From Swiss-Prot:
Substrate binds at T44, R45, R85, D105, D106, V107, I108, F109, K110, G111, R112, T113, R138, V162. The keyword Glycosyltransferase applies. The gene is pyrR. Belongs to the purine/pyrimidine phosphoribosyltransferase family. PyrR subfamily. Regulates the transcription of the pyrimidine nucleotide (pyr) operon in response to exogenous pyrimidines. Also displays a weak uracil phosphoribosyltransferase activity which is not physiologically significant. This is Bifunctional protein PyrR. Its EC number is 2.4.2.9. The lineage of its organism: Bacteria, Bacillati, Cyanobacteriota, Cyanophyceae, Nostocales. It is an enzyme of class 2 (transferase).
Length: 180
């Protein structure tokens, strides 16, 4: 990849904290029974985001919600373009039948990752409802998928990249827009 021409901070650590609090509040408001809520983070950055949202929901409501990690490697429709990758480990320890599942991802772009995640979820039961929470929605969909919960709407050029940094994974919290 070429050297970035510009890097713009979109969310600072404090902005990210506020955004996660707002997302958690919205999820709580739209969930009829929090005891049936399961947050499924999509590898890679969706996993720690799901954990952060679960902690925030516990802070807000005093309830532990289910959290899992979803690897979509074998459900992707672009394996011929990106090549086979070593799959991460899906970690879903409960039957999703009848649950309110919120898929969590860092950035939604074309929508293809979420399409693959929807296919993968069916391997673990039939949820009552599946919703989608994303930290950043940058537009440019290629499939008709729309998130239910959005931290930040960020119109971008197709060649720009949104980078999400999380303390537990990267040593800092931030969201940046990188232009080339």
């Amino acid at each position: 990849m070429a050297t970035p021409a510009k890097v713009i901070e979109i969310l600072s650590a404090e902005d990210l904290r506020r955004t996660l609090t707002r997302l958690a509040s919205q999820i709580v408001e739209r969930t009829r029974d929090l005891s049936q809520l399961v947050l499924l983070g999509i590898y890679t950055r969706g996993v720690p985001l799901a954990e952060l949202l679960a902690r925030q929901i516990e802070t807000l409501e005093g309830i532990n919600v289910g959290v899992g990690a979803l690897d979509i490697t074998f459900y992707r429709d672009d394996l011929d373009q990106i090549g086979l990758r070593t799959p991460a480990k899906t970690s879903i320890t409960l039957d999703l039948t009848g649950k309110t599942v919120v898929l969590v991802d860092d950035v939604i772009f074309k929508g293809r990752t979420i399409r693959a995640a929807l296919n993968a979820v069916n391997e673990y039961g039939r949820p009552e409802v599946i919703r989608l929470a994303v930290l950043v929605d940058r537009g440019h969909r290629e499939v008709p998928i729309h998130p239910d919960f959005v931290g930040k709407q960020l119109p971008t050029a197709k060649e720009e990249v949104v980078k999400v940094y999380l303390q537990d994974w990267d040593g800092r919290d931030a969201v940046e827009l990188v232009g080339y």
